[in-house]
Amino acid sequence: MNTYKPYSERAKQHSNACARSLLELMERKQTNLSVAVDVTTKKELISIADAIGPYICVLKTHIDIVEDFDADLIQQLQELAKKHDFLFFEDRKFADIGNTVKHQYANGIYKIASWSHITNAHTVPGEGIIKGLAEVGLPLGRGLLLLAEMSSKGALTKGSYTTDSVEMARRNKDFVFGFIAQNKMNQYDDEDFIVMSPGVGLDVKGDGLGQQYRTPREVIVESGADVIIVGRGIYGQPDKLVEQAQRYRQAGWDAYLERLALHNK
């Protein structure tokens, strides 16, 4: 199964351009760490991105919470992405009809498609949401993740919702290259959906607001995900930013090497 192959091998075989770029980057930098930087000022976002950039494969943003957002922020972030070699994932969680999301993705003040390599969407509105986003994203070489499972307590993203989301992805593999999920989604030998898993923590199990945390090993080795998404465990400790980023990068990479050893004997 592709889930258990080296990232470099998967990159060579992958049909999706965005997935290839991500897998190649992960192998090149030896990191499967994505950091969710949910801060509300331009200064904080740039400062954190610069500090953790060397250790991540993906910087995950909620760009609409930045109170002093401007075009210069995007330009500075793009320069940091070149400097440190990482991709952007704007965690927009689109959830409207195709015609609406098309404009939300391309236009408005954020112009997400112009700078973010990866974005994501709920499948509640049906397949039209994928078609609308693809109209904008495909010509730019962007990639889409579907929200198949969430890490919050009581989430409704389970059962038939998850199953139907996977079927939608299979029908749109030119643009959809993976999922936000808690477990691997590949069921067939020729499938290679990349799974990015939020809710990863080494020190705590929850936050009192419904978030449930798992360790990098649980996520990568036991559940078969590919990228760990860490938020407050890194940016929540400003005096230990680099130390924590290095710690999670190492834990994630060690888990990946363990998975390779287990399945490629």
From Swiss-Prot:
One GO MF term: orotate phosphoribosyltransferase activity
Listed InterPro entries: Aldolase_TIM, OMPdecase, OMPdecase_AS, OMPdeCOase_dom, RibuloseP-bd_barrel
Record's keyword terms, sorted: Decarboxylase, Lyase, Pyrimidine biosynthesis
PROSITE patterns for the chain: OMPDECASE
Biological-process GO terms, alphabetical: 'de novo' pyrimidine nucleobase biosynthetic process; 'de novo' UMP biosynthetic process
EC number, as in UniProt: 4.1.1.23
Superkingdom classification of source: Eukaryota
Residues involved in substrate binding: 38, 60-62, 91-100, 213, 232
Pathway stated in the Swiss-Prot or TrEMBL entry: Pyrimidine metabolism; UMP biosynthesis via de novo pathway; UMP from orotate: step 2/2
Active site: K93 (proton donor)
Recorded catalytic activity of this chain's protein: orotidine 5'-phosphate + H(+) = UMP + CO2
Protein family according to the UniProt entry: Belongs to the OMP decarboxylase family.
Descriptive protein name: Orotidine 5'-phosphate decarboxylase
Encoding gene per record: PYR4
